[in-house]
């Protein structure tokens, strides 16, 4: 991996995407809850979402967050939120948006993570891909234009809606501010890429 430095604002973007990816793809353990509890947001909406996440994490246990995660994303039959591009764009899982994403991943040299059973169009997987594109996890940081095209094709059409659904989900406690943070990041990215 080329260790060329990335701009501070891009490091923040990559960190936010990585945080969202981690929280969406797996149940937070005690170490993760402790790290979340230690976060301090700055002024503004994103900072407020980070502070809310931090405060709630202080009162959560691994068992309580596991229950919440299972109700939200797994459920009996299905969870309250199905965080997949295919579902949001077509109403079904494993559809054309997933096939299109897999093609783009091949083109960019992005490999499916080993040991992951979720389809690649899962919101958490897409957040991890964006973090990797920004930070250089796939060899070197990808050009902003490549990031923009990927975001506009595979994330922008649906992810803000998904994060908004998570933010408002009946069972969301820890995941309500995760939804807020994701919704806000999607809005910032859309606006930034629009004026780029």
Predicted feature descriptions by range:
Residues 1-196:
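Surface/interface-facing alpha-helical segments and adjacent flexible terminal/loop regions used
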């Amino acid at each position: 991996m080329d260790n060329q430095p990335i701009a501070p604002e891009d490091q923040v973007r990559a960190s936010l995407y990585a945080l969202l990816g981690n929280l969406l793809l797996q149940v937070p353990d005690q170490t993760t809850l402790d790290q979340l509890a230690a976060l301090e947001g700055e002024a503004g909406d994103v900072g407020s979402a980070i502070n809310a996440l931090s405060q709630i994490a202080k009162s959560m246990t691994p068992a309580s967050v596991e229950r919440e995660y299972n109700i939200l994303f797994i459920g009996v039959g299905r969870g309250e939120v199905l965080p997949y591009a295919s579902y949001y764009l077509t109403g079904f899982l494993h559809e054309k948006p997933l096939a299109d994403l897999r093609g783009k991943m091949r083109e960019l040299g992005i490999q499916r993570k080993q040991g992951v059973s979720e389809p690649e169009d899962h919101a958490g997987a897409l957040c991890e891909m964006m973090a990797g594109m920004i930070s250089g996890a796939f060899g070197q940081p990808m050009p902003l234009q490549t990031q923009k095209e990927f975001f506009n094709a595979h994330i922008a059409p649906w992810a803000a809606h998904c994060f908004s659904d998570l933010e408002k989900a009946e069972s969301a406690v820890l995941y309500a501010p995760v939804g807020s943070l994701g919704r806000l990041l999607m809005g910032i990215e859309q606006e930034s890429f629009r004026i780029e």
